[in-house]
Curated annotation (Swiss-Prot):
Gene designation per UniProt: morA
Protein name: 4-methyl-2-oxopentanoate reductase A
Chain positions recorded as NAD(+) binding sites: G162, I163, T240, A241, R242, D266
Role according to the record: 4-methyl-2-oxopentanoate (MOA) reductase that reduces MOA, a possible intermediate in leucine synthesis, to D-leucate in a NADPH- or NADH-dependent manner, but with a preference for NADPH. In addition to MOA, shows broad substrate specificity toward 2-keto acids.
Catalytic activity: (2R)-hydroxy-4-methylpentanoate + NADP(+) = 4-methyl-2-oxopentanoate + NADPH + H(+); a (2R)-2-hydroxycarboxylate + NADP(+) = a 2-oxocarboxylate + NADPH + H(+)
Length: 329
């Protein structure tokens, strides 16, 4: 019987994981170091592993699945089931070259991440950090200033996937006009009443810009000094996707100059380190990457990973294969 290797922990769907013992030998690497994991691989402890369940905490144990790690993975490995919508810590091209299929957890994260995006957007528009911190310091309103209403504002969404569309649905309830830019225009059914615009037009005409796209080599620092210069004065920036989509030093400069009115961020370029200029700026709403941290979403993510794993073993294909491999496996 082939094996499945769990890296990290399963918290909410432990029973479903254990039920897979009818079709797989279950092996676990619950904690340890990258060196421990590499040594285990080299010693042949995982030589019959067909599929890996990569939990959303696994990176702190093994580090990224880069070329070094891929080189020592067992030759029996055919599938990596990753728990997370973002998978920039997996060398997908390297996996493809080795014949390893990779899945992620889109859809399951859409609602929770969009909720946090709206929370950050409203918080940034109202510059809510100032009164929140003043109240806790016993200063009542402190240096609170007038905020901005969302009604009538243009929300520009960069990356109109599942999370972006849920963000749009919620923003429309606030009376916002929605425009977006994607690599390609959506179908009329998915687009709804949102307007498709060029990247430059999105930058130039949005009152709020929400980043909802994947991080890869072509999108790293997609928002930097040059892009800030093209934006409206007083724009609000929201990022719940990946921190490195934005050049954080350029964002700090844009905030200091007033080009950017405020920002709401859940992700950072060098997590868990946050650019000090962002920490020190009272115009910025900061959260510590909690976009999917609800009980319901975490359970749904774990179940989707397990469904991918079962499908891989029983059908030879996964449900939510990463887009880069759609025409490969």
């Amino acid at each position: 019987m082939p094996s499945a290797l769990l890296i990290g922990e399963i918290t909410h769907a432990r029973k479903e994981w254990e039920e897979l013992s009818s079709i797989l030998t279950l092996t676990e690497f619950p904690s340890g170091t990258r060196e421990d994991f590499i040594r285990n691989c080299k010693e042949g402890q995982y030589d019959d592993v067909l599929v890996i369940y990569r939990s959303n905490t696994s990176t702190k144990f093994t580090g990224p699945f880069d070329a070094e790690l891929l080189a020592v993975l067992p030759k029996s490995l055919k599938y990596i089931c990753h728990n997370g919508a973002g998978y920039d810590n997996i060398d997908v091209k390297g996996c493809t070259d080795k014949g390893i299929a990779v899945s992620s957890t889109p859809v399951a994260v859409n609602h929770a991440t969009a909720d946090v995006g709206i929370f950050l957007m409203i918080g940034a528009l109202r510059q809510a950090y100032v009164p929140l911190s003043a109240l806790r310091a016993g200063q009542w309103q402190g240096q609170t200033t007038l905020g901005r209403d969302p009604q009538g504002k243009v929300l520009g969404i960069l990356g109109m996937g599942g999370i972006g569309r849920e963000m749009a649905n919620r923003a429309k309830a606030f009376g916002m006009k929605i425009q977006y830019h994607n690599r390609s225009r959506l179908s009329p059914e998915l687009e709804g009443d949102a307007t498709y615009v060029s990247f430059d037009e999105l930058l130039a005409s949005s009152d709020v810009l929400s980043l909802n796209l994947a991080l890869n080599a072509s999108t790293r620092h997609i928002i930097g000094e040059k892009e800030f210069q093209k934006m409206k004065d007083g724009i609000v920036i929201v990022n719940t996707a990946r921190g490195a989509l934005i050049d954080e030093k350029a964002l700090v400069a844009a905030l200091d100059s007033g080009k950017v009115l405020s920002a709401g961020l859940d992700v950072y370029e060098n997590e868990p380190v946050v650019e000090q200029g962002l920490v020190n700026n009272p115009k910025v709403m900061l959260l510590p990457h909690i976009g999917t941290m609800t009980y319901e979403t975490q359970k749904d993510m774990e179940l989707l990973v397990l469904n991918n794993l079962r499908s891989a073993v029983e059908k030879g294909k996964m449900i939510t294969l990463v887009p880069e491999q759609k025409n490969v496996f």
